[in-house]
UniProtKB/Swiss-Prot annotation:
Organism of this sequence: Methanosarcina mazei (strain ATCC BAA-159 / DSM 3647 / Goe1 / Go1 / JCM 11833 / OCM 88)
GO biological process terms held by the UniProt record: methanogenesis, from carbon dioxide; methylation; one-carbon metabolic process
Protein name: Tetrahydromethanopterin S-methyltransferase subunit F
Family: Belongs to the MtrF family.
GO terms under cellular component: plasma membrane
Amino acid sequence: MAEEHEKGVPMVLAPQMGAIDATVESIRYRAQLIARNQKLDSGVAATGIIGFAAGFLFSLLMVIVLPVAVGL
């Protein structure tokens, strides 16, 4: 009688995992895209003020300092 409990229920059909695997891969791909985009946004936000200051100083150099130095 103990042998009957160890056998379990025989599987009639093999499980169809193709659709589940495709869905899991789709979710994994989307999660990676979201993570990449979030990292990019964080990097841009962290360096935005420095980039703005560098661009402003460069524009002052090009508009004011160089024409005065050249004599225009």
